[in-house]
Regions:
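Phosphate-group recognition and catalysis centered on beta-loop-alpha active-site segments
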Residues: 1-218
Length: 218
């Protein structure tokens, strides 16, 4: 088991506050999350905004710039999921996101997540220094095979029911990290800990941190 299990706040802390909002991200940061996870979409006028839905409703979706302003609150990592729902190549979207990362000089504090491995391949091409995380939710493939397909991503983020100790050990042997999603029940946290994962993505980072502290893992 890693010496420190990293806590990733899913969409901030959606068990406590409205997801993908500045308030949820601030809450997760203040409670001690190591990373805040968020979904990114591209608007028709070229704005990168934080939203789970590809079609935006009128509402207070924060811009990526707004969320990057929170960087001064700590040394946490930004888990940026680039959501792409088109057969077209995502080059433009990736370039917009990378431009913002460079503008804010946050290359060392972001990890790019995606289910669409084209996104990860483009990011790897233009910014090889930025960490990549391959999201996966189906299949029995070894995590190192998933990472290889995903532009040699450094981290694999599987749906947590896919996690086994054997898969995690094989991933670690290949110098990969495993960070499952979205894990919210204490019994499932314990199962992930027993499997040896490196971090956990959860809707309730405060509760997970308390759970880890009670077990001397924080």
């Amino acid at each position: 088991m890693p010496a420190r299990i990293l806590v990733h706040g899913h969409r901030g802390a959606r068990a406590r506050l409205a997801e993908n909002t500045l308030e949820a991200f601030q809450y997760a940061i203040n409670c001690g999350a190591d990373a805040i996870e968020m979904d990114l979409v591209l608007t028709g006028d070229g704005q990168v905004v934080v939203s789970h839905d590809p079609v935006l409703e009128a509402g207070p979706e924060p811009r990526l710039d707004d969320v990057f302003l929170l960087a001064r609150m700590g040394s946490f990592v930004y888990d940026l999921e680039i959501k792409w729902h088109s057969p077209e190549q995502p080059d433009t979207f990736v370039e917009f996101v990378l431009g913002k990362i460079r503008e804010w000089r946050l290359e060392a504090r972001v990890s790019i997540f995606s289910f669409d491995f084209r996104v990860l391949g483009i990011m790897r091409k233009f910014a090889p220094e930025i960490r990549l995380t391959a999201l996966t939710e189906t299949g029995a493939r070894a995590f190192n095979e998933v990472a290889k397909e995903a532009a040699n991503a450094e981290t694999v983020a599987p749906e947590f029911h896919l996690v086994t100790r054997q898969k995690v050990e094989a991933a670690h042997a290949a110098a990969l990290q495993v960070v499952p999603w979205t894990v919210n029940a204490p019994r499932d946290w314990d199962a992930m800990l027993a499997a040896g994962v490196d971090g956990i993505i959860t809707d309730d980072p405060a509760a997970l941190i308390a759970h880890l502290e009670a077990r001397g893992l924080r």
